[in-house]
UniProtKB/Swiss-Prot annotation:
Record keywords, A-Z: Cytoplasm, Heme biosynthesis, Iron, Lyase, Metal-binding, Porphyrin biosynthesis
Catalytic activity as recorded in UniProt: heme b + 2 H(+) = protoporphyrin IX + Fe(2+)
MF (Gene Ontology): ferrochelatase activity; metal ion binding
Family classification: Belongs to the ferrochelatase family.
EC category name: lyase
Domain of life of the source: Bacteria
Species: Microcystis aeruginosa (strain NIES-843 / IAM M-2473)
Chief location: cytoplasm
The protein's name in its UniProt record: Ferrochelatase
Cellular-component GO terms for this entry: cytoplasm
Length: 387
C-alpha cells in the first residue's frame, strides 16, 4: 500500500485580530458561500464585505481572547488520532488542511507530496455534509487532482459524512450526560441543539443533504442518550437577508422563554471544536438572548475537541475507509443525474442568452447600489444588518 496519510479538513480561523479581515475575504471569496452570476464580481464583493465586517468581527474575537483556538485544537486532534491509529497497528501520518486560513488545504497537499504519501484518507471534521463546508473543500481538492499529474497517481478515498457513526454518537451523548448530571433536576432540563445554518436554497434548490443529516443526527443522539428530556433543534449564524434554515436559534430561545422553560442545556451539534460560534455566539450572544427571554439557567455542552470516544470514532472511520472500496470525488459530485454537489453547477440564472444578459445587467446595478450605500451609509443592506 505504501505510506498512508490522513488529511483532516476544517474551516480555519484567524489566530490574531489582524488576521480577521483577510480571513473574511477568503471566506466570502468562496462561491459556495456567496454565489454571483458574474465571477468577476466575487472578489470585489468579498473585499467590500470583509472590509465592512472586519471591525465587528474583531470585537467578537477580542471577546474570546483575540483569536480563534481552532488550529490548536485541530492540531491536538491530529496528534491524538495519529497516536490512536499507531496503537491500532496503523502507521499513518495526519495532516491538517484549512479552507480559509493557515495552514491552507493547498499547503497540506504540498506536504503530503513531499512525504511521498501513496494512499490518502480525506476526512472532513464536519459530521454532516454540506456543499458549503465539506463540499467546498472537496471542490478545491478535486481541481488539484485534475491539474496535478502526481496527485492523479495518489490513491485516495473520501469520508463524506459520519453523523450517524455509533462511537461519535456515544461521545456526544456522554458530553450531554455529564452536563445533565450537574443539574439538580436533570430530567427537567430542556436540551437545545444549535447547528450552523445554511441558506434554505441550498437544500431546496441544490439538494444539499445537510438539513436531513442534522435532523437525523439529533434524533440519533437523543436515542443514544436514552433520557426523557424534551429537546429543540435550531440553526444559528445566519448572515444577510435571505432565508436560512429555520427555526433560527435566537427565535427558538425566545419561544422557549415564552413557554416557561427555565433550565436550558445547549448542544453545539455541528461543531467538533471550540471556536467563535461556540465561545462567542453561543456563550455570549445567545446567553443574553436566553436570559432576556426568562431562561434562568443557561448551560452549554463543550465541543468534542479531543474527547477519547471522539478520537476513537475518527480512528474507526479511517481504518474502515482503508479496508473498503475508495470513495472518489466523482461519486460525491454526481450522486444522481439531476443533482450536483456544487450550487454553481446546479442553479441556473436564465434559460436564454437574453436572460443571461439581463442577469448580468441586474448584477451590475446591484453592485453599483452597494457602492452608493457604502458612500451614503444608508440603505436596505444596513437596515437588515448585512453592511
Amino acid at each position: 500500500m505504501g505510506r498512508v496519510g490522513v488529511l483532516l479538513l476544517n474551516l480555519g480561523g484567524p489566530e490574531r485580530l489582524e488576521d480577521v479581515r483577510p480571513f473574511l475575504f477568503n471566506l466570502f471569496s468562496d462561491p459556495e458561500i456567496i454565489r454571483l452570476p458574474i465571477k468577476g464580481l466575487q472578489k470585489p464583493l468579498a473585499w467590500l464585505i470583509s472590509t465592512l465586517r472586519a471591525s465587528k468581527s474583531q470585537e467578537n474575537y477580542r471577546q474570546i481572547g483575540g483569536g480563534s483556538p481552532l488550529l490548536k485544537i485541530t492540531e491536538a486532534q491530529a496528534t491524538a488520532l495519529q497516536q490512536r491509529l499507531k496503537e491500532m497497528g496503523r502507521e499513518v501520518s495526519v495532516y491538517i488542511g484549512m479552507r480559509y486560513w493557515n495552514p491552507f488545504t493547498e499547503e497540506a497537499i504540498e506536504r503530503i507530496k513531499r512525504d511521498h504519501i501513496k494512499k490518502l484518507v480525506i476526512l472532513p471534521l464536519y459530521p454532516q455534509f454540506s456543499i458549503s463546508t465539506s463540499g467546498s473543500s472537496f471542490r478545491v481538492l478535486e481541481e488539484m487532482w485534475q491539474q496535478d499529474p502526481y496527485l492523479r497517481l495518489t490513491e485516495y478515498t473520501l469520508i463524506p459524512s459520519w453523523y450517524d457513526h455509533p462511537t461519535y454518537l456515544s461521545a456526544m451523548a456522554d458530553l450531554i450526560a455529564r452536563e445533565l448530571e450537574q443539574c439538580p433536576n436533570p430530567d427537567q432540563v430542556h436540551i437545545f441543539f444549535s447547528a450552523h445554518g445554511v441558506p434554505q436554497s441550498y437544500v431546496e434548490e441544490a439538494g444539499d443533504p445537510y438539513q436531513r443529516q442534522i435532523e437525523e443526527c439529533t434524533r440519533a443522539i437523543m436515542r443514544t442518550l436514552n433520557r426523557p428530556n424534551q429537546y429543540t433543534l435550531a440553526y444559528q449564524s445566519r448572515v444577510g437577508p435571505v432565508e436560512w434554515l429555520k427555526p433560527y436559534t435566537e427565535d427558538a430561545l425566545k419561544e422557549l422563554g415564552e413557554q416557561g422553560i427555565k433550565h436550558l442545556l445547549v448542544v453545539p451539534i455541528s461543531f467538533v471544536s471550540e471556536h467563535i460560534e461556540t465561545l462567542q455566539e453561543i456563550d455570549i450572544e445567545y446567553r443574553e438572548v436566553a436570559e432576556e427571554a426568562g431562561i434562568e439557567h443557561f448551560q452549554r455542552v463543550p465541543a468534542l475537541n479531543t474527547h477519547p470516544m471522539f478520537i476513537e470514532s475518527l480512528s474507526q472511520l479511517v481504518v474502515k475507509s482503508l479496508e473498503e472500496k475508495p470513495t472518489t470525488f466523482e461519486q460525491i459530485t454526481h450522486p444522481k443525474a439531476n443533482m450536483k454537489m456544487y450550487p454553481q453547477e446546479r442553479w441556473e440564472w436564465g434559460m436564454t442568452t437574453a436572460a443571461e444578459v439581463w442577469n448580468g445587467r441586474l448584477a451590475m446595478i446591484g453592485f453599483l447600489a452597494i457602492i452608493i450605500e457604502l458612500i451614503t451609509g444608508q440603505g436596505p443592506l444596513h437596515f437588515v444588518g448585512l453592511l
